[in-house]
Amino acid sequence: GRKPFRGWFMWLWQRAKSGATAGRSFFTAALALVLTTALFVPQAAEARHRATSHRAKAPVNWANVSLTDPKKDAALIIDGVSGRVLYARNAHALRHPASLTKMMTLYMLFESMKRGQTTLQTVMPVSEHAAIQHPTKLYLRAGQSIDVEDAIKAVVVLSANDVAVVIAEYLGGTEDHFGEMMTQKARQLGMNDTFYHNASGLPDDRQISTASDLAILARHLAYDFPQYFHYWSTTGFTYH
């Protein structure tokens, strides 16, 4: 039968939506939460997620923002429409992007659909390399397949590492080559301090980005592919 999934990635959207009243404030809130709760050194990221996801849904007073370690943490809040910086700390400091890597993985997938290279119904095969990725994952097995729409939902809802690799291999042949493609796309978007080497964000010392670069990517995801933006509000999906 089909299995229902509800995952940790959806809290970014839910938390943003709770304090938003209009398009401008909504996207600003979404960017604020993405860039202040998720772009930390790897050891702090998961703990910060657990802490923030259970806080009361009250408006944030940015004047009182206190980060755990100002020397390590990075934060950037921008107006999602104008790009104006509202709050910044270590915005250009290099950090490991962790699962925010998947923002670029999906950007590449959305771009392939816009170009007509794939559709939501395109079926992508699962390799052994994809199947052996560490959790979180959809626990796909080598030889299985997944269509593009389920892959998008698995990445957004579950932050599925195996599915991110399936996308990478389908679009780039190998995950290594896809990392090069992602880095090239980052340069085209103006993300000059970002280097990708995998599609999932699993630990790799060479994979780095900045809060500033990820803000650029977040805006491009919204404005380059508005037809797919609704996927970011997905709170669950069923996969067989």
Predicted regions located by residue number:
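Active-site-adjacent loops and short helices of periplasmic peptidoglycan-processing enzymes
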Residues: 47-212, 219-225
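Proteins with a high burden of low-complexity, intrinsically disordered sequence enriched in S/T/G/P/A and R
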Residues: 40-41, 112, 147, 240
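Extracytoplasmic
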Residues: 213-240
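N-terminal secretory targeting signals
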Residues: 1-74
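Short intrinsically disordered, low-complexity coil segments enriched in acidic
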Residues: 1-5, 160, 236-240
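Intrinsically disordered, low-complexity regions enriched in small/polar residues
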Residues: 7, 28, 42, 89, ...
